[in-house]
């Protein structure tokens, strides 16, 4: 298959280094993320996202839901693996035609200790 017809899985958006604010064992599995960060990174609600704990190396695949300002909440089974105060990166990926992927720049959102966006840019 030539470069033009191939599909590549590429980073679409990332939020880092976010701080986990709460865990909720009784809620449906997933991640609640500050709505402003969802929009800034180009995520969509119910999208599959990857979450990486930058200190332990734990990696999870989660459903994304919109949360309150400053919120990074792990729900359900994920709450057993990562604790409040942990620093995490949250990323989404998507398929693109190889040719388009060569020019693609993902949305990268850096946040402060209160999970407020301090810088948004395109990677590259």
Name these PLM-found stretches:
Residues 2, 8-10, 19-21, 25-102, ...:
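Compact, glycine-rich, soluble single-domain proteins
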Residues 106-124:
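Short, glycine/charged-enriched hinge/interface segments at domain edges or termini
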């Amino acid at each position: 298959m030539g470069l033009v017809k191939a599909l590549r899985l590429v980073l679409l958006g990332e939020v880092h280094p976010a701080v986990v604010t709460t865990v909720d064992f009784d809620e449906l599995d997933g991640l609640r993320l500050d709505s402003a960060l969802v929009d800034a990174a180009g995520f969509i609600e119910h999208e599959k996202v990857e979450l990486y704990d930058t200190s332990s190396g734990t990696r999870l695949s989660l459903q994304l839901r919109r949360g309150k300002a400053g919120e990074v909440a792990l729900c359900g089974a994920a709450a057993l693996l990562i604790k409040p105060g942990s620093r995490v990166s949250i990323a989404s990926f998507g398929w693109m035609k190889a040719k388009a992927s060569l020019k693609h720049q993902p949305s990268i959102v850096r946040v402060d200790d209160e999970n407020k966006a301090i810088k948004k840019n395109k990677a590259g």
